[in-house]
């Protein structure tokens, strides 16, 4: 049985407060996009699970892979046979696209459906939350306003980017998320929340729909700012970094012709948003 875990982008990301526990509260819109990995399982005649990862390399030991953490979380509640798991990575890691979190949540859904486990989406989302703050998003997989640590979701009725073209570029830059939060120059509520701005026409988002990480990370990594400007030069209605990076995305009315010389060393992907 095979599924295709998809990525997400952040539309705006406001870091609104630093908490007493050292973490930060955020306000951001999560939007699913059709950049996908492939995840397949089969029952195996053995005493333990086996995970094989292909495609884009990921910097994680097998036992640290979120797919394995998802299986272990389900095994604490249910008994099911050992599995052979094949994961083909197309979503780059360390990009702000939620690839690992998506893999974990799709694994939860896949095992549930494969073995007809008696657990609904709400219970599955609760398990997903124990794996990562944004993992529950991929259980419902619909556009939401994410608040608190990014795990409290408010639906966005009638909000859709369907029909727009999207381009993603990710340079070979690694950004440590904890360091990115530590380096923030702005922490606090802004005048308008992301879920209000996204209902405006997309070509009015520029300058309004802000990712707070850009202010601190762009001076440190000028290449990120250059790629964002390249997306605008290529005709983007809106362009931004997703999460704490290092992937950037642009939204276009038509299929864009990107500056190939500017992205020769980048991961790049384009599609129409369904």
Curated annotation (Swiss-Prot):
Keywords: ATP-binding, Isoprene biosynthesis, Kinase, Nucleotide-binding, Transferase
Catalytic reaction(s) noted: 4-CDP-2-C-methyl-D-erythritol + ATP = 4-CDP-2-C-methyl-D-erythritol 2-phosphate + ADP + H(+)
GO MF, one annotated term: ATP binding
Binding-site positions, ATP: 92-102
The protein's annotated pathway: Isoprenoid biosynthesis; isopentenyl diphosphate biosynthesis via DXP pathway; isopentenyl diphosphate from 1-deoxy-D-xylulose 5-phosphate: step 3/6
A GO biological-process term: isopentenyl diphosphate biosynthetic process, methylerythritol 4-phosphate pathway
Entry annotated with the keyword Manganese: no
EC supergroup of this enzyme: transferase
ATP-binding listed as a keyword: yes
Coiled coil regions in record: none
Source organism, top-level taxon: Bacteria
Catalytic center residues: 8, 134
Enzyme Commission designation: 2.7.1.148
Ranges that cross the membrane: none
PANTHER family: 4-DIPHOSPHOCYTIDYL-2-C-METHYL-D-ERYTHRITOL KINASE, CHLOROPLASTIC
UniProt similarity note: Belongs to the GHMP kinase family. IspE subfamily.
Function: Catalyzes the phosphorylation of the position 2 hydroxy group of 4-diphosphocytidyl-2C-methyl-D-erythritol.
Protein name as annotated: 4-diphosphocytidyl-2-C-methyl-D-erythritol kinase
Organism of provenance: Porphyromonas gingivalis (strain ATCC 33277 / DSM 20709 / CIP 103683 / JCM 12257 / NCTC 11834 / 2561)
């Amino acid at each position: 049985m095979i599924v295709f875990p998809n990525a997400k982008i952040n539309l705006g990301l406001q870091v609104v407060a630093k908490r007493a526990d050292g973490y930060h509260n955020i306000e951001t819109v999560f939007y699913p996009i059709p950049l996908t990995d492939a995840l397949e399982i089969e029952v195996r005649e053995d005493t333990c699970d086996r995970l094989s990862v292909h495609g884009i390399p990921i910097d994680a030991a097998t036992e640290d892979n979120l797919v394995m953490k998802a299986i272990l979380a389900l095994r604490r509640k249910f008994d099911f046979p050992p599995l052979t798991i094949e994961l083909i990575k197309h979503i780059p890691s360390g990009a702000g696209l939620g690839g690992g979190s998506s893999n974990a949540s799709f694994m939860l859904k896949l095992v549930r459906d494969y073995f007809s486990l008696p657990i609904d989406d709400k219970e599955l989302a609760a398990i997903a939350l124990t794996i990562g703050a944004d993992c529950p998003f991929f259980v419902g997989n619909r556009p939401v306003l994410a608040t608190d640590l990014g795990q409290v979701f408010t639906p966005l009725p009638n909000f859709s980017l369907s029909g727009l073209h999207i381009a993603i570029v990710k340079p070979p830059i690694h950004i440590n998320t904890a360091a990115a939060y530590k380096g923030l120059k702005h922490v606090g509520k802004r005048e308008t929340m992301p879920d209000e701005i996204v209902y405006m026409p997309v070509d009015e988002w520029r300058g309004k729909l802000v990712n707070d990480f850009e202010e601190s990370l762009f001076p440190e990594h000028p290449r990120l700012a250059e790629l964002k400007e390249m997306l605008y030069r290529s005709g983007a209605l809106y362009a931004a970094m997703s999460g704490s990076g290092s992937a950037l995305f642009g939204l276009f009315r038509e299929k864009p012709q990107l500056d190939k010389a500017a992205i020769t060393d980048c991961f790049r992907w384009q599609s129409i948003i369904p």
